[in-house]
Amino acid sequence: MAWQGLAAEFLQVPAVTRAYTAACVLTTAAVQLELLSPFQLYFNPHLVFRKFQVWRLVTNFLFFGPLGFSFFFNMLFVFRYCRMLEEGSFRGRTADFVFMFLFGGVLMTLLGLLGSLFFLGQALMAMLVYVWSRRSPRVRVNFFGLLTFQAPFLPWALMGFSLLLGNSILVDLLGIAVGHIYYFLEDVFPNQPGGKRLLQTPGFLKLLLDAPAEDPNYLPLPEEQPGPHLPPPQQ
């Protein structure tokens, strides 16, 4: 019964958050069970473009390291802030949310080439947190019961925490930079004098992922209208 309740609760999670979180957990579980090796997952441009191992363009965003404190810490923030974005500013805009993932992933991959970064999942997490924090500037965040501050400081607090754990902050900086580029192009520049929205979600994504817009001129059939329905007249 507990598993059924947990499964039912998980199915209530928005689709993109559910899919990405599940993919990360399953990838890590496969590595832990030695079904996969991290060497099969990391981003390597030579193997991608010369050996056509194109799955590495995706799998490097799914592996957050072996099971341990760092993995659960990252999964907590991925799940929480991905869900808050999907249920908040991207509510009813699944295609736009997926496009943000694609835009961020492509830009991180290109910039990651300069720094020889092999796994970019943590950068994607930092991007999600950054975009949420800029769209929720008045929200106060309690950081593990130790500090309370305004949401825009959260990405920097996470970067400092990574530094305390002995991790490189280059990945966090990359995620923050890409998150800022997305936020500027999507939320800031279109509202400037002479500005316009430069990021346009492709139509095929909207067709696949978003519910069709309702036609304001559509008149439902009598049997589709609310209220009691009279039986058709006898012939």
UniProtKB/Swiss-Prot annotation:
* Organism, as annotated: Homo sapiens (Human)
Q: Transmembrane stretches, by residue range?
A: 23-43, 59-79, 99-119, 158-178
Q: What is the lineage of its organism?
A: Eukaryota, Metazoa, Chordata, Craniata, Vertebrata
Cell location = Endoplasmic reticulum membrane
GO biological process: what's one of them?
Answer: negative regulation of retrograde protein transport, ER to cytosol
Molecular functions (GO terms): protein-containing complex binding; signal recognition particle binding
The protein's name in its UniProt record: Derlin-3
Q: Where is the composition biased (Pro residues)?
A: 223-235
Q: Which cysteines are joined by disulfide bonds?
A: none
